[in-house]
């Protein structure tokens, strides 16, 4: 049964990786990163359940707290970027790109 949870977590993680690599919408990329964090939490919870140790569950709670803080900060940043650029496409965020290549 634990193999099923590990398999689900790996599938979720790789769906998140594909979302980060293939998508151009900054909100979709943000949600893919959150999916990867949840997959990591599921792996820790699975191994904590297998070893009957509470350390993994503490790490899961820490991951959930970090994900909540990241979600609030990330969504606020996304809203500000949308207000400034009127788009969530990552191709238009190129202010740091070196334009003068000599």
From Swiss-Prot:
One of its GO terms (cellular component) is plasma membrane. The lineage of its organism: Bacteria, Pseudomonadati, Campylobacterota, Epsilonproteobacteria, Campylobacterales. It is found in: Cell inner membrane. The chain crosses the membrane at residues 2-22, 26-46, 58-78. This is NADH-quinone oxidoreductase subunit K. GO terms for biological process: ATP synthesis coupled electron transport. Its EC number is 7.1.1.-. Keywords: Cell inner membrane, Cell membrane, Membrane, NAD, Quinone, Translocase, Transmembrane, Transmembrane helix, Transport, Ubiquinone. It is a multi-pass membrane protein. InterPro entries: NADH_UbQ_OxRdtase_chain4L/K, NUOK/Mnh_C1-like. One of its GO terms (molecular function) is quinone binding. It comes from the Bacteria.
């Amino acid at each position: 049964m634990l193999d099923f949870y590990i398999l689900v977590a790996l599938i979720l993680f790789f769906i998140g990786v594909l979302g980060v690599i293939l998508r151009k919408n900054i909100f979709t990329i943000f949600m893919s990163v959150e999916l990867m964090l949840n997959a990591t939490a599921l792996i820790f919870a699975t191994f904590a359940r297998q070893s009957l140790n509470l350390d993994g569950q503490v790490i899961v709670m820490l991951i959930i707290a970090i994900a909540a803080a990241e979600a609030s900060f990330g969504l606020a940043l996304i809203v500000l970027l949308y207000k400034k650029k009127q788009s969530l496409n990552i191709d238009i965020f190129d202010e740091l790109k070196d334009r003068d290549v000599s």
